[in-house]
């Protein structure tokens, strides 16, 4: 493969300042986020507001990181004015691009000079559809239901037919590489609206597909035996073991799902996929590394993993349990009081739970992001101790700068 790391982009999800810092520190090339209304996670993440756009853009631009604002819900007539306000604010803040699914959003972005990327909600599955949308957008997310042979064919046709976006460059292909999978095609689900009058297509999904269900014969009242109660809850996508095939197929932007996830999720997933892409490029993409990435990815939020449809699988794989199957869970200990830069030591308040020497710790914060460390040493009143008790203030060595009021957790086997 005659490529370098600059040809590929890892796009991180952010729903909070903590996850933004985690994405930056882990080496993401771009971030995507919403600001309340008109995005597909408007009810499930700690969203930023329109007033945060300038700060986010300035923070990311200083690091050379692209910023993508999601305005990708169904748009009704009464939403047009709000949509215009959001796009105008994005332009004023120097946001890199808007992720859109409604043509009204695309047209207004083009009118005012804002770059457009196509959302997964469009379910783009063939070259003719992509050619139509190329008049609006420079980057397109292809449908998650495609396999890599189909993706490669689309990529080859982009090159052969010289299908370019408004910037005059060939359309870049973006694909989801990791995270939650919807039971409906490209997320176009109506179950939540039917059950709770909350539309998934307006960012208000209640995720009732994640519950367990029984099948009952209405005439007899008998319940039918099924092999899995979670008949509509897919496992999460994980592609790190075959990221090389995605790169070969023409995928250039690797999108991570998870705007509602914590900073430890963002940091872990971004760093694993960044390492994987670099390993493919430098010829060290080994089975041993794949196993290590698998292990690390299993420690953060997941519902079990499968390959999606990317390698030709026709049927979905469903989770066997409800909720998070991560191998580790975080337990709140307390907070950071002070950081001593010359010593590389943090003073922490032990408030909610104790911790002992050798335990795995996590520190999170708006600027710190997610910092993983081991409690190699604990000192209380300058004396070494093996256990930090509730109510104590202790000092621990940390690998980098932390800030007052950063949260301290221990990570325990789940």
Which residues does each PLM region occupy?
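Well-ordered mid-protein domain cores that form the structural environment of catalytic cofactors
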Residues: 83-119
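Aromatic- and glycine-enriched glycan-recognition loops and surfaces
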Residues: 45-54
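Short, glycine/polar-rich helix-capping loops at beta-to-alpha or helix-loop-helix junctions
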Residues: 125-130
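Surface-exposed amphipathic alpha-helical tracts and adjacent flexible/coil segments at the periphery
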Residues: 1-26, 30-42, 56-57, 63-73, ...
């Amino acid at each position: 493969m005659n490529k370098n790391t600059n040809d590929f982009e890892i796009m991180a999800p952010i729903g909070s300042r903590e996850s933004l810092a985690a994405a930056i520190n882990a080496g993401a090339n771009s971030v995507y986020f919403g600001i309340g209304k008109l995005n597909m996670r408007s009810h499930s993440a700690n969203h930023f507001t329109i007033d945060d756009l300038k700060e986010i853009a300035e923070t990311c631009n200083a690091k050379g990181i692209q910023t993508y604002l999601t305005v990708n819900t169904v748009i009704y007539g009464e939403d047009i004015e709000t949509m215009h306000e959001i796009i105008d604010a994005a332009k004023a803040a120097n946001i890199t691009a808007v992720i859109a699914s409604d043509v009204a959003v695309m047209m207004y972005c083009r009118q005012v000079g804002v770059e457009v990327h196509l959302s997964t909600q469009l379910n783009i599955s063939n070259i003719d559809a992509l050619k139509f949308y190329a008049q609006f957008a420079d980057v397109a997310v292809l449908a998650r239901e495609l396999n890599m042979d189909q993706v490669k064919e689309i990529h080859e046709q982009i090159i052969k037919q010289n299908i370019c976006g408004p910037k005059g460059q060939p359309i870049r292909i973006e694909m989801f590489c990791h995270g939650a999978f919807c039971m409906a095609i490209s997320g176009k689900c109506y179950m939540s609206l039917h059950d709770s009058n909350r539309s998934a297509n307006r960012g208000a999904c209640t995720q009732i597909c994640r519950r367990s269900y029984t099948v009952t014969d209405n005439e007899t009242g008998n319940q039918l035996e099924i092999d899995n109660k979670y008949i509509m809850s897919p496992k999460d996508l994980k592609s790190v073991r075959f990221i090389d095939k995605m790169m070969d197929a023409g995928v250039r932007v690797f999108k991570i799902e998870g705007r509602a996830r914590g900073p430890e999720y963002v940091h872990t997933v971004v760093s694993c996929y960044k390492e994987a892409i670099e390993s493919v490029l430098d010829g060290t993409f080994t089975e041993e590394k794949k196993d290590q990435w698998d292990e690390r990815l299993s420690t953060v939020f997941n519902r079990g993993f499968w390959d999606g449809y990317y390698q030709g699988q026709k049927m979905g794989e469903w989770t066997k349990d409800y909720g998070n199957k991560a191998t580790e869970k975080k337990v709140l200990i307390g907070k950071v009081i002070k950081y001593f830069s010359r010593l590389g030591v943090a003073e922490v308040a032990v408030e909610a739970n104790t911790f002992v020497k050798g335990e795995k710790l996590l520190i999170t914060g708006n600027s710190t992001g997610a910092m993983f460390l081991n409690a190699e040493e604990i000192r209380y009143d300058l004396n070494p101790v093996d256990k930090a008790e509730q109510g104590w203030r202790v000092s621990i060595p940390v690998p980098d700068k932390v800030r007052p009021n950063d949260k301290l957790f221990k990570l325990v086997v789940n």
